């Protein structure tokens, strides 16, 4: 599995009153996402254990290697 070497803000999302968010079409297409695909939300926490960020990962890609892939990405985004 290749790891992402660059991270950037892809979109600003808004949650509706039902708690739903919409991923822009261009982002869905680039990520190869389609209706019915399952995503895992991984929460990043600050020093007070407050959730400060969420990462969405395709469910079929989640395994024991995810921590080693996600950790460097978080460092680039949050410090």
Swiss-Prot record:
Keywords: DNA-binding. Gene3D superfamilies: 2.10.260.10. Pfam families: MazE_antitoxin. Residues 10-60 form the SpoVT-AbrB domain. The keyword DNA-binding applies. It comes from the Archaea. GO terms for molecular function: DNA binding. InterPro entries: SpoVT-AbrB_dom (IPR007159), SpoVT-AbrB_sf (IPR037914). This is Uncharacterized protein AF_0476. It comes from Archaeoglobus fulgidus (strain ATCC 49558 / DSM 4304 / JCM 9628 / NBRC 100126 / VC-16).
């Amino acid at each position: 599995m290749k790891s992402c070497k660059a991270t950037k803000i892809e979109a600003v999302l808004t949650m509706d009153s039902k708690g739903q968010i919409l991923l822009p079409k261009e982002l869905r297409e680039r990520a190869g996402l389609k209706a019915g695909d399952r995503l895992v939300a991984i929460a990043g926490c600050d020093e007070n254990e407050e959730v400060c960020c969420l990462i969405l990962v395709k469910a079929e890609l989640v395994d024991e290697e995810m921590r080693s892939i996600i950790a460097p990405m978080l460092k680039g985004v949050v410090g």
